[in-house]
Amino acid sequence: MLKDGIGFDRVIVCCGRVDLRYGIDGLSSYVRLHYSLNPIEKGTLFLFCGTRADRIKGIIYEGDGTTLITKRLSKGNRFQWPRTPDEAKELSKEQYRLLMNGFAIEGTIREFHAEKHEKAPGTDTGILEKSS
């Protein structure tokens, strides 16, 4: 169910770290209080990740009740979880699939440092040649 994306219409990732000791009531309250979203919106999966990033929890309201889902990855594996606190993001089916398969869903922009990429004097390639 989780890896295939079957059984729900929308996926909302609750970014940052959440105490995974919470159950259905605690996670539902978290969604209401931190994101002002409705945790009993039918067909919407809310996902949460803890500090270790090797496990996630999800809640989904199915019309007649709420289901609590837990997934723990094998030793050495981690979810690439967005860590921006106080933010909830809706994922496309493709982003969800990438997340469940261990890929990051957010790109990282790194600062460019020109001094690390300067060309060596007298060369076009930027590669220092060994003198004989």
Where are these regions (language model features)?
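Polybasic/polar functional segments that serve as interface/processing modules
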Residues: 1-132
